[in-house]
Amino acid sequence: HIAGSLDDEINMYTGLMIYNHKMTTVVTPTGSVFSGGTDLFAAGYPRILQRADTSKAIEQNKQVGVHSWAEGDKTAKEFPYTNESHRSQATYFKKVMGDKGIAFYMFTLNSAPASGEHWMTKADSDKYSFITRIE
């Protein structure tokens, strides 16, 4: 299980290493990614999800989760999009996901509040070409 990150800069640096070395990322049947863990998963190609239970929809397995972020008592959407945190995240997702990266980042901001969680559906994944193979 890879959950949220304590340091977004290090997390994005690590993600860019995964991306630059053309590494595959895999969520195993007993694994999951959430928040910063999902950011790392995004850096791989291909991005493979091995479902915990193949009889369930992927969101019911709770293996790939996203949410917004906050800084102190301010939510991400309370910061202007010119803010360094937004620019860094948008640049990261554009780099590792291409043309759908910024739209995916915006999706995470709207998916659930920073204290909440949204487990990605197949429709979510398909819209952003996020999970490249589901097993």
What are the roles of these predicted feature ranges?
Residues 67-135:
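Charged, glycine-interspersed solvent-exposed loop segments at helix/strand-loop junctions
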Residues 1-8, 23-30, 74-80, 110-115:
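Second-shell loop/turn segments in exported
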